[in-house]
């Protein structure tokens, strides 16, 4: 297994999640199906709670905006002739419709996030990480390396995944989190913003991601980069392979101070 020698200036590792620390199938094959299979039960159990009603209100507002779309599913306002059962079924149908088109509306993401939080806390869901991830980040921390997450998923969602993982609570191994509020992952400025936020130079950061466009944006900002190749990730072209340093496991990351 070829080693990736980390340049001496690096004191920070910035990690992507999907396809890097976590199987890319986790969201598609675990998180999304959980919502579809449990949304009605969740709404029945939490319907009277303020948070749930706020989620429904946001979905109703989104439904009004979507009324011009083909096949859109309405959610009636809470007038007296609409029973709770009828309202819940309307919300379920609307969520199914949105998810069938892989939509990312704020209202949908908010409800999904609350459902996942409940499932993580109750133990119904566990965040998945590749087997090489935890031993590697523990070793890096022993070397004094700081570790941050940068994902398109919200910081709250990141903390749930790592806080309730199959390997236990991993948040204590991480120094911080970034999401797209710091900037989009394919824009170089985002990586300079992250360096400024951490309080280091771009050249002090090694970014690990499975997405070549993100790697090139980070590299343009002055970061060191390795593209992580995992089963199920998007295939790399020959040009990608020639332009990027590639690894298949975190175990290939080697620091000068390691024996």
Curated annotation (Swiss-Prot):
Places the protein is found: Cytoplasm; Nucleus
E.C. no: 3.1.3.77
Principal localisation: cytoplasm
Pathway note: Amino-acid biosynthesis; L-methionine biosynthesis via salvage pathway; L-methionine from S-methyl-5-thio-alpha-D-ribose 1-phosphate: step 3/6; Amino-acid biosynthesis; L-methionine biosynthesis via salvage pathway; L-methionine from S-methyl-5-thio-alpha-D-ribose 1-phosphate: step 4/6
SUPFAM superfamilies: HAD-like (SSF56784)
Alphabetic keyword roster: Amino-acid biosynthesis, Cytoplasm, Hydrolase, Magnesium, Metal-binding, Methionine biosynthesis, Nucleus
InterPro entries for the chain: Enolase-ppase_E1, ENOPH1_eukaryotes, HAD-like_sf, HAD-SF_hydro_IA, HAD_sf
CDD domains: HAD_EP
Entry's cofactor comment: Binds 1 Mg(2+) ion per subunit.
Claim: Ubl conjugation is one of the keywords in the record: no
Reaction catalyzed: 5-methylsulfanyl-2,3-dioxopentyl phosphate + H2O = 1,2-dihydroxy-5-(methylsulfanyl)pent-1-en-3-one + phosphate
Pfam family, one: Hydrolase
Residues the record lists as binding Mg(2+): 16, 18, 210
Cofactor or coenzyme needed: Mg(2+)
GO MF annotation terms: acireductone synthase activity; magnesium ion binding
Residues that, per the record, bind substrate: 151-152, 185
GO BP term, pick one: L-methionine salvage from methylthioadenosine
GO cellular component, one term: nucleus
Assembly information from the UniProt record: Monomer.
Job description of the protein: Bifunctional enzyme that catalyzes the enolization of 2,3-diketo-5-methylthiopentyl-1-phosphate (DK-MTP-1-P) into the intermediate 2-hydroxy-3-keto-5-methylthiopentenyl-1-phosphate (HK-MTPenyl-1-P), which is then dephosphorylated to form the acireductone 1,2-dihydroxy-3-keto-5-methylthiopentene (DHK-MTPene).
Family listed: Belongs to the HAD-like hydrolase superfamily. MasA/MtnC family.
Name of the protein in its database record: Enolase-phosphatase E1
The species this protein was found in: Xenopus tropicalis
Encoding gene, per UniProt annotation: enoph1
């Amino acid at each position: 297994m070829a080693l990736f020698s980390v340049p001496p200036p690096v004191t920070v590792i910035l990690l992507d999640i999907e396809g890097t620390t976590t199987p890319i199938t986790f969201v598609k094959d675990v998180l999304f199906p959980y919502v579809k299979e449990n949304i009605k039960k969740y709404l029945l159990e939490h319907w009277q709670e303020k948070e749930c009603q706020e989620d429904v209100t946001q979905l109703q507002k989104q439904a009004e905006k979507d009324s011009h779309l083909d096949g859109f599913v309405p959610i009636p306002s809470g007038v007296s002739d609409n029973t709770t059962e009828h309202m819940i079924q309307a919300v379920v149908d609307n969520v199914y419709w949105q998810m069938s088109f892989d939509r990312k509306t704020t209202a949908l993401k908010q409800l999904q996030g609350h459902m996942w939080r409940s499932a993580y806390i109750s133990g119904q869901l566990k965040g998945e990480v590749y087997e090489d991830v935890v031993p590697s980040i523990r070793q890096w921390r022993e070397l004094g390396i700081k570790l941050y997450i940068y994902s398109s998923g919200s910081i709250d969602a990141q903390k749930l995944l790592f806080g309730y993982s199959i390997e236990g609570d991993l948040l204590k191994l991480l120094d911080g989190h970034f999401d797209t509020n710091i900037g989009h992952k394919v824009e170089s400025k985002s990586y300079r913003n992250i360096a400024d936020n951490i309080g280091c130079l771009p050249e002090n950061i090694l970014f690990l991601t499975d997405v070549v466009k993100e790697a090139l944006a980070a590299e343009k900002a002055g970061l060191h980069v390795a593209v992580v190749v995992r089963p199920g990730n998007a295939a790399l072209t020959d040009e990608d392979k020639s332009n990027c340093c590639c690894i298949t496991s975190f175990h290939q990351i080697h620091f000068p101070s390691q024996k």
